[in-house]
Amino acid sequence: MKKKIYIAGCGGMLGEAFHKCFGSTYELKCTDIDVNETWLSYLDFRDYESYLRDVSEFKSDYLFHLGAYTDLEFCELNQDDTYATNTLAVENAVYISNKLNIPLLYISTAGIFDGAKDTFDDWDLPNPMGHYARSKYAGEIFVQNNVDRHLICRAGWMMGSGPKKDKKFVQKIMKQLKY
C-alpha cells in the first residue's frame, strides 16, 4: 500500500514538479485555490476547517504545504493578503500536522536573506527584505517552534512550466516583450 501525501498549494511550478516526482510512488491529493490541472482539487488552505477536513478524510501520512503568494510586486501591494496566505495559513498547516500527528514539509524561500553576502549557510541569520520574504520567514519561525516533525526547505529562483504557471520576473519580462 502506497504512503499518502497531501499537497496544499500545488497549482504552481513547484507543485507540478512534486506531482510528477511523487505521483508514481505515493498516493497524492493535490489541492489549490486555482484548479488549473485535472489532477488538482479545490482547497483554500486559509480556511482551517476545510483544510483539516480534507487532510483528515484523505488519511495522509505526510502534509506538504507549498502554497504562497510569490509575486513580489503583488506581495508589496497587497500586504494583508500576503500575510493571510503566507503566514497565517501556515499556522493552519501546523495545527493540522499536530492534530493528525503527521510530519509537515514547509516550503520557504532563500529570499529570507538580504543578499549582503555571495553565499549563505544554515548558520547565517535571516534578514528578510520585503513583505514576501518577511511573511515566509514568519511561517518558518512558527513551524520551527510548533511542530516536532517538520522539514523546512528554502527554495530559490524557480523557472519553468511556461506562462500558464510562471508568474515570476522572467515571465513578466517575456510578457512585456510580446506587446
Enumerate the language-model features and the residues they cover.
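A hydrophobic alpha-helix adjacent to the NAD(P)-binding/active-site core of NAD(P)-dependent oxidoreductases
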Residues: 40, 82-85, 128, 132
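Rossmann-fold cofactor-recognition segment
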Residues: 33-49
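NAD(P)-dependent short-chain dehydrogenase/reductase
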Residues: 141-179
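NAD(P)-cofactor binding segment of oxidoreductase domains
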Residues: 77-105, 142
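NAD(P)H-binding glycine-rich loop region in Rossmannoid oxidoreductase-like domains
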Residues: 45-85
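Active-site "gating" loop of Rossmann-like NAD(P)-dependent oxidoreductase/epimerase domains
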Residues: 69-72, 77, 107-130
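Active-site helix of classical SDR
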Residues: 135
